[in-house]
Amino acid sequence: MLTWLEQFLIRYPELALFLVIAAGYWIGSFKIGAFSLGPVTGALFAGLVVGDFAHVPVSSMTKSFLFLLFLFGVGYSVGPQFVQAMKRDGLKPVLLAVVVCLTGLAAAIAVGRILGLDPGFAAGLMSGSLSQSAAMGTATDAVNGLAVPEAQRALYISHIAVADAVCYIFGYAGVIMWCTVVAPALLKIDLRDEALKLERSLGMSRAKPGLASAWRKFELRAYRLDEHSPLIGSTVAAAEARPEHRLFIHRIRRGERVLQAEPGTILAPGDVITISAPRQIIVELIGSRAEEVEDRELLDIPLISADVFLINAKLAGMNLQEASQQDWTHGLYLRSLSRGGQELPIAPGVVLQRGDLLRIVGPEPVVENAAKNIGVIVAPSNSIDFVVLGLAIFFGGVVGVLVSFPVGSIKIALSTSVGTLLAGLLVGHLRTLDPRFGRIPDGAISLMTSLGLAAFVGLTGIHAGPIFLSALRDSGISLLLGGMVVTLLPQIVGFCFGHFVLRMNPILLLGGLTGA
């Protein structure tokens, strides 16, 4: 049975890859406390097992194809925020990332030389220790460019996967331990308390409803005002001027007439008003203190929901509190806000950026007018602009091959990997200028990034499987100890630089360390 399975996997390597992907995601789903390998590292270990069991042939073109899809997807997803983040946040996060990355690179080079590691082991040491499995792809590109015999290159590429597998577990767990236990102890802070402080600085509230809840699901109801109502004698604008809640008066029935609620209209006893607000706000502010009226004509206000792509440069840079004070937001509700496929919390201090996707709700004329002030309405679509996708990767790869810079006596090219990543950044950024350009749905981007990297790493594991155990016996302990140094040194240096030099907020500092 095992012999048949071995021959089957060798004969049908594409099926072996799908087996590795499935096993990788299954392995990555297991958790020990807060620790889990994740699907990418799970795919690496699954690939090593399958590769050790059966010498499955691996196509280098397939590996490159998958890795380039992953890189383009990453660039595309962060492109809309990349330039804006540079403008908004300044150099602090960038400088922190540069220091951490350069320290990690220098540590990997130094440890590699001290231990006498070959290029493959050294590259895997870096990718595993820094828990950056994507570096396996660029390292493979670099190894393929070495002027050594083909057999030697194949051995080096196998060593990348071996070293990554050995170093990854501490590379992942070590950063978690540093950022959740050691660093907070050194800073003498409680992570939860600091996170709550940061939330409050952004206007978020967990204890009571505020802007976050008032800009979500809402009701449209009609109420008759009696002579004891606190709203009697006040204008519509004054009744709506509640900074802690978002409430709007749309129409007023006065006798037989239906009036549009103008800001200067004074409310009188007997008026029936239509109010839109979140359900809990209506209950808290009005509740049983007013008579609810079922007035079909008054309540017949067409409401629509629209996804609007933010391209207005004047709006970008405002926080939600400032944006909500614009004249054209009257009667408008923000149901959700997403950036790069990730939904953001709705709070007064959250700053808008070009490329954000806002789902707004309100009366049809209000939504249409707001969309003009925000950007353009994006119609739901599952179509992919394959023309832009293919040409961007092609020309990005061409630029990566042709552009080089001197380092000492040699020239180093950007490589197809870096070129493709830059192409993704460019296309993603251009979409902030015209969202109709290069459209790729979030689901497709997620597939490119998650499946692309997991499949690439799985193939690398399959390739390294036949020599994994022997390489582990020869270099396992030295790789593990060296990996610990490469994991912790960048964290320590980055922590000191961010805290003492940049004086960053503790939560942002620790977040930057995990991201860098």
UniProtKB/Swiss-Prot annotation:
One of its GO terms (cellular component) is plasma membrane. It is found in: Cell membrane. Keywords: Cell membrane, Membrane, Repeat, Transmembrane, Transmembrane helix, Transport. It comes from Bradyrhizobium diazoefficiens (strain JCM 10833 / BCRC 13528 / IAM 13628 / NBRC 14792 / USDA 110). It holds the Pfam family Asp-Al_Ex. One of its GO terms (biological process) is potassium ion transport. This is Uncharacterized transporter bll3475. One of its GO terms (molecular function) is monoatomic cation transmembrane transporter activity. Residues 208-291, 296-376 form the RCK C-terminal domain.
